[in-house]
From Swiss-Prot:
Additional comment: Heme 1 (or BL or b562) is low-potential and absorbs at about 562 nm, and heme 2 (or BH or b566) is high-potential and absorbs at about 566 nm.
Family, per entry: Belongs to the cytochrome b family.
Pfam families the record matches: Cytochrom_B_C, Cytochrome_B
Residues engaged in binding heme b b566: H97, H196
GO MF term list: metal ion binding; ubiquinol-cytochrome-c reductase activity
Name of the protein in question: Cytochrome b
GO cellular component, one term: mitochondrial inner membrane
Amino acid sequence: MKILRKNHPLLKIINHSFIDLPAPSNISSWWNFGSLLGVCLMIQILTGLFLAMHYTSDTTTAFSSVAHICRDVNYGWLIRYLHANGASMFFICLFIHVGRGIYYGSYVLSETWNIGIILFLTTMATAFVGYVLPWGQMSFWGATVITNLLSAIPYIGNTLVEWIWGGFSVDKATLTRFFAFHFILPFIITAFVLVHLLFLHETGSNNPSGLNSDSDKIPFHPYYTIKDLLGILFLLMALMILALFFPDILGDPDNYTPANPLNTPAHIKPEWYFLFAYAILRSIPNKLGGVLALLLSIIILAAFPLLNTSKQHGLIFRPVTQTIYWIFIANLLVLTWIGGQPVEYPFTMIGQIASVIYFATIIVLMPVSNTIENNIIKL
């Protein structure tokens, strides 16, 4: 079996990626979230496949087809809630994975990092088009508001919006194409994941100390397969508790009302994992400026490898940047809270301050603290 594992053309790839892969001996549980994201992706594809068997992407029957899945399909309610809450678990793991990458300086592996940003954007796009499919009030108005942002693009904006809608408003054509996008994008994500792993295995993984670990490697199996399995058990336990006991806690009550173009909800807001970006979008009074800020809130992650001037790897021995990092995380939570609040004083003011802090920590404070710490080392 050992000979076959190492010589067979297909098994050899799996062996070098998951069995005999040399891994640093000191990587902590923060490194588990990559494998957890893989599990989340598999859960989403499988539950999504079963949902697609019963869902109809037509404006007249979409809402009732989701109700039919929950009421008449065997364990349809469970599949639906696993899929909906699986998306939340996916984004929790994604945020922690990116946060760990920033804290431990994983962005120095720039190819892996940049593919990760593309993955982040693609996952956000997938979640957005997926949220439209149940055709509830928030689905319809969320789709209308977010797609309408493209009209801010000079010259081609209005044409582009009508092209995406497939008409002059969000309607049957929009729902059908969003369903098509939602079905194909997870497979594109899977392809990008393989590229992400390819680049990661070219350079080897980072580790908490930030030091070169070439002299101290251990095989991935059994050490990290067991560790990942423990993480997967915790993930599945959290997902099942969420889906079985609190299935609607992260959803919006408005989405249990069928879409009505003549009745606008009091507060249009996206799912919780988009609220930080939505708060940044709303904090800028100009439409085009808001759209650019929204895009920059994610794309700015690509600036980390470019702005990194530190002589040390990661933040483990850098108290100044550590403090700024935790300010950044706290600020992100504030933005998430503000994104779910109505557009009125003092929320607008807090949102604007938090948006400035968000960009300032990445562009100004972290590079400045890098320079300060480099000078301290010289003393």
